[in-house]
Amino acid sequence: MPWQAGKRILITGANSGIGYHAALKLARKGAIVMLACRDRKKGEIALDRLHTEAPSTHTELVILDLASLSSVREFAAQELGKNRPLHVLINNAGVMAPPRRQQTADGFEVQFGTNVLGHFALTGLLMPALERAAAESTERPRIVTLASVAHKRGRLNFDDLQSTKSYSPMKAYQQSKLGDLMFAFELDRRLRAASSPVMSIAAHPGVANTNLFLRSDHSAAQKAVRGLVAHAIDMFLNTDAEGALPTLYAATAADAESGGYYGPQGFQEMRGDEVGAAQVAPQARDEAAAARLWRVCEELTGVRFL
């Protein structure tokens, strides 16, 4: 990974898992890393751990709840008020397959509302800081959006994006991850059309052995069973540190391309420490559907850009 001194990098969901390991690696390379966390206590624990593992690094904790558009707006306003550049935005945070349908503070299904709408709003509101970075640096700013191999089974149900008619935990998750990937691709197209130097890149971690696996809202019994399964199949899955590699590649590699999608190159893209171009399902390349999704995101969030 290239040296990152002087770059300000914001990572959502950075208090644990892939987000934490990405923050750790970037901090060790000299970046100024902002850990965006919903829970202050968990964020402070993560920040203390990071300072222990990487002393004398430049990190800060910011409170941001992607399941609340008012929280997103408040954070973005505070950040823009500091008049400082943002060189890399990593849209990492995610909710995975809660067994019962839940809603965000704004009434959206929690996976679509957090994974797609929250990051859409955050990206749009922080665009001035990314453009400021472009004006002050010779390097192009980057927006990295985390998708998933689960997008391959995803379908955008525009008649029921909020899963109010029928809720399936995994179908809602797959839809949200397809939405993330389509957002990243559509964002790239719009940035290019606007002749913007900002890059939009997607990545996925493979299947990490803590890939929201035990952190989702399941009963103690379900978590116990999932824990046993996770231990049994660890050999086939990525660690969180390995899972962070595609994110780091997208955020820092000189040959990462805007509009690209990167993931591990091991069996079925499930694991591996080699990163390369990831497989894209045909539905993720549907430009008409992506444009429609963009309009829906604008309408639901009230955030309009590009």
Question: For the regions a protein language model found, what residue spans apply to each?
Answer:
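Pocket-edge positions in alpha/beta enzyme catalytic cores
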Residues: 35, 64, 235, 282-285
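Rossmann-fold NAD(P)H-dependent dehydrogenase/reductase core
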Residues: 1-222, 299-306
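C-terminal helical subdomain
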Residues: 176, 227-278, 285-291, 295
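Short coil/turn segments at secondary-structure junctions
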Residues: 106, 110, 167-171, 231-234, ...
